[in-house]
Every structure is written in C-alpha cells, then in structure tokens.
C-alpha cells in the first residue's frame, strides 16, 4: 500500500492510496471461496460448485465489495500511520479499476485543528459578590402574589400596573398598515410589549373613552416597512382592570409546599430557592466570561463538518421547541444557526484542549453534588437522585457538566479575577437579558 497526503485548503486533506493488484486478488479469492460454500446452482450440490462458475456468476459483485472494504480499511491504516485526526465523515473518490492492475483512490476530509492555548493570563473575569437579603425576599414574595393575582374591573383611569382591553387601528399618513389592527386586545401594562409610547398613551384614560395616540416605530423594528415611521393609533378603551393581590394567608402559603402554612416557613423556602438560583447565576456569569476570554485569546479554524453537525443539532432542537418534525427541521435556514454552531465547536475544541493538557477527569464528588443541587428543586429530591443514578446517559451528561466546570476553574486559576459587589436583582436581570 502506497500513501501520499496533501493539504487541499485550510483544514482540508486528501489522502491518495494505491493498493497492489495481488492484495486485491488475494482478498477476492478468499471471499469467493467463502461464497462457494453457500452457493446454490442447478446441477451442483451445495458447496460443490466449481470456482470458475462461482467467479463467473458472483465475481463482479464480490470484487466490488472487496474494493469497498479495502478502501475503508486501508484508509484507517493510513491515517493511523500518518497520525492524522479526521473531523467528520470522509469522502471516498475511487479511481478507475482494471482487474489485475494496482488500484488507486483518494479520500478527502477535514482534520481537527492543532490547538495551542495562549494568553490565558490575559482573560479578565468579574465575579459577582452578592447575598440574598430580606428586601430581596420581600420582592420575591410580592412577585409570587402578583403571579396569583386576580383582576377586577374598575372605572378609574388606567395606570402602569393595570390591565386594559382595547381595540386599536394604526395608520401612517392616513393609511392603515398590515398588522396594525386588533379587536379585544388584552394589554398587561408595564411589560413593554408594545412599541414605545403606546402604553403611555393609554395610561390616564378610562373605560369607554375613544382617543388617538402618536407613536414612532423604532429604527430597529422587525418590519422593514415600519422602521422609523411615525404612526397614529385610534383606540377604543373597552375595559380597565386592577390587580387584586392575595393575602399571605395560611391557605395561600400552603400552595407553595410549606406544610405549616407559616410566613416564616414561606420566607425560608423562598430564600433557599433564591440562593440556589443565585449560585447558578454567579457560576454561569463567571463561566461565560472565562469562555469568552478563552475564545477571544485563541483564534482557531474549525472543520466545516463539525459546524454542519452542530447546525443539525440546533435545527432539531428548534423544531422540537415549536412542535416540528425532522423534515421541518431540515428546512430551517442554515444562516439562523451558523454563528451559534461555530461558537459551540470553537468552545468545545478549546475546552477539550484544556481538559487534555491538564489531564482532567470528572470528579465524582462534584457529579454527585451537581445532581443533588439540581434535585433539590423538586418535590422529592431523593427520587430524582435515584433516577439519575440508574440512567447511564444522564450520568454521563452530568459528568460532562462537571468536567466543563473543572476546565473553567483551570482557566480561572490563570485568569485575572476581580470581585464586583452587586445586588440580587441586578445580577438576575443581567442573566435574563443575556
């Protein structure tokens, strides 16, 4: 077997392999002998068909199978010998085959990039320093009450805390535009769902009033024909409702799993959940900065095959979120996922090199702690822990999470880490925005 390797472009490689004719004929003869044992041809007993007849009848197909097998096996031998690490499936390009002659073919593929980590000391990370205080718990209790609130119709003017039911018709230069009209539209005020100026124009009006408001569509508005345009909305305000918050009664508190129904018990449960969320938010904030710094400091090429694989994964995930199927997933535009897919590949390669260089292995104590932390959010944590322990795939996924955390900690040991005091609400708002 003769082997030559050439670089086509970037990470692209072409391996050209020549297989000696005698190796091919030897393999073909061996396969024909095996086939002859089971061949049934009229006039001959099973296993006693002359080899020349077996070759005449089956030689072409056996030869084709042998060539396919030799191409794969010799390629594997070649990349092992040449110490090449292919990324993605190879493309076999067979040459012309003539019986009794050497056979030459080529294989085209991409390789993994050679990653040399650098400038890890230049990575800068701000670690949020924050605690859950009583005021944070009070705010969360108020949020819980709002989530359980009921609505009561009022004759008073609408405020930023109310809910309004209205009809509206939008127009630009006196002409109605597509998507600018609705009937019995329910608007929860203060959530920023509408374009700037719309809610403000409703506030102060009472049910039964008809009025017009002037607004400007933002320059970055999603509809091209409306970007930056001035518009008028004719509004009929049909109903205004005020939010009625439930009292923190024993019955209300028990809805949240606090058995004794006490306010102290609810506050303790809320604080525990907030601290768990806070721990995760701090961890993710630090991790994101560390990985961003790693990516910025290490510009590497990525194999197209790996990016394509990630795009397929992201397509399927997107389709599943919206109830789509495999066919619909494949039809989603590549451009929607390409940037995210490329970043995932880059991050995977760089963290993989961190793990390899430092010979990291998943810490089983950390794996156990991660499962326990995740399980604590459920009604029966022990049941969740046992479910994970019996599921090999879930355990491997959690080991990967632990290993990634260990890789990030390795980065942080070299990075410039400074502590930044902040508040619970600021951190959680940043997390939501991200």
Curated annotation (Swiss-Prot):
Keywords noted in UniProt: Cell cycle, Cell division, Chaperone, Cytoplasm, Isomerase, Rotamase
* Keyword ATP-binding applies: no
Q: Which GO terms describe its cellular component?
A: cytoplasm
Coiled coil (residue ranges): none
Q: Mainly localized where? A: cytoplasm
Q: Which reaction does it catalyse?
A: [protein]-peptidylproline (omega=180) = [protein]-peptidylproline (omega=0)
Query: Which EC number(s) does UniProt give?
Result: 5.2.1.8
HAMAP family according to UniProt: Trigger_factor_Tig
The protein's job, in short, is: Involved in protein export. Acts as a chaperone by maintaining the newly synthesized protein in an open conformation. Functions as a peptidyl-prolyl cis-trans isomerase.
The entry's protein name is: Trigger factor
Question: What organism is the protein native to?
Answer: Yersinia pestis
Q: State the gene name recorded for this protein.
A: tig
